[in-house]
Amino acid sequence: MSAPRDVVVVLLDSLNRHMLGAYGGTEFDTPNLDRLAARSVRFTNHHTGSLPCMPARHDLLVGALDFPWRPWGSIEIWEDAITTLLRQHAGVSTMLASDHPHLFETGGENYHVDFGAWDYLRGHEDDPWRTRPDPSWIGAPALSARRPTWERGYDVSRTWFRDEVDFPGPKTMVAAASWLDGELSAAREPHERALLVVDEFDPHEPFDTPEPWASRYDPDWNGDRLIWPPYARSQEQSGLTERESIHLRSQYGAKLSMIDHWLGRILEVVDQHDAWDTTAFILCTDHGHYLGEHGFWGKPQVAVHPELGHIPLLVSWPGAAPTTSGALTTTVDLHATLCDVFGVTPEHRTHGQSLVPILEGTASSVREWALCGVWGREVHVADATRTFAKAPVDENRPLSMFSNRWSTMPIRAIPGYRMPRPDERAWLDRSPGSDVPVIRQPFDPSDDIPFWGMGGFRGDVLYDREEADGGEFRNRSGGDADKEMTDLLVEALRTIEAPAEQLVRLGVG
């Protein structure tokens, strides 16, 4: 079995595993994802690591778990993205095609810079693309006014989308397919190789699509289209009626099916060049998105349940027969796999395990546990069949942020929100495997903390994933298995040399 010459990585944001045909979903159509799955190793035990969007990109592109040290931020000065390694040491042609606005704002501003080339396709979510609506037509739909002011920036961008191909998702897939076609058509030397990363923000909200997608799964809806899901920890808190909930879910499905359709453009390029025998194709996501399951909506401040954390992974590998793997895997393993394929070794500490032995059939597993979490919230550990979420104790303290970039997600939606800057409480510490001093800022209970860490805690959660996949969710915490899973959690945190205060705030230190 020969190693792939080229690699394509397509990350679809907020991709719900249980809604894909390849994973048993029947609610929405995903023919191209299903077509890819039919030629791939389909991983059924793949999980998020750091949440949400940018922490997950850090796991993928840098290979080090982010959430034990900080909430959301750019690449630190002691780290290198894999694209840096490929440029400096491997001579690989690298390309990023993306409509993901967080990659190009404070907190994500340097993930793209070491790609050989990058194409930012504008207009998704709150991307500040236009300052005024397109004055030449009145083609934008009447979007629901039930949304915060910051989200209305999308309405301005939306007036510039005249046809389906003008939407950010289709634009991104067309741009990626065009680049790949050019690369595979070029008269390359035998040593020339390529990595294409498609960071596609769909099916992330807003769940806005043109017809015929918009009415595909809810043709009887007569009101304004609802495209902005609430972030809520209960159905009551969401403010949605039962009928509105059904409609909003249908709009997620519309966006999922639309981006699946345009994904076909990239698959067609690989088909046309007969490049499957020389190309590894990885389809992944950062996390799922609650659409009313357990009463949750969006990505609220709750423990990570299967709909959010148990995610799809498809890998088409040259010479590998289509099959299913139940190996436990997580996002940092994709970084390790890319390093293995291209023969590069990071100098900074990483946490992934290459999946190449599984893909080539020489191993059935590469890890015994996987960590997952949001900075400042529960820490989760998964073994082969169970996931355990340990909730903080004692006011969730001590809690510190470790970073020299000191950039985090802009929180424009929360008036008056101010996260503390480094102050007299800060001191210089070290990150594992690095001699570079890093600012360590403690947070007091009176401090604002980053948005994703806000909210109360509901205690420990332990669930069997096979049960949960079958539609039955039972919190098994409180029994004899708690100690076993707590011991595994402590072992995992100590293995990655997480800050000792993580054990203290979780009540296990």
Task: Outline where the language-model segments fall.
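Active-site-proximal N-terminal segment of extracellular/periplasmic enzymes that hydrolyze or transfer
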Residues: M1-T44, S50, R458, G471-K483
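Active-site regions of oxyanion-processing enzymes, predominantly non-cytosolic
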Residues: S2-V9, G108-D119, T149-S157, R162-D224, ...
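Short, solvent-exposed turn/loop segments enriched in Gly/Ser/Thr/Pro and often Arg
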Residues: Y23-G24, S40-L61, G73-E76, L96-G107, ...
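Histidine-centered active-site microenvironments of extracellular/periplasmic hydrolases
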Residues: F28, P206-W221, V269-A320, T330
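Catalytic-site neighborhoods of secreted/periplasmic enzymes
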Residues: D59-R162
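Substrate-binding rim/cap in mid-to-C-terminal beta-strand-loop elements of soluble/periplasmic
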Residues: L60-V62, S238-R243, G264-E268, Q272, ...
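A long, amphipathic alpha-helix that forms part
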Residues: F167-R188, A232-F281, V341, A492
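C-terminal, low-complexity/hydrophilic appendages and adjacent surface loops
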Residues: P306, V374-S477, G509
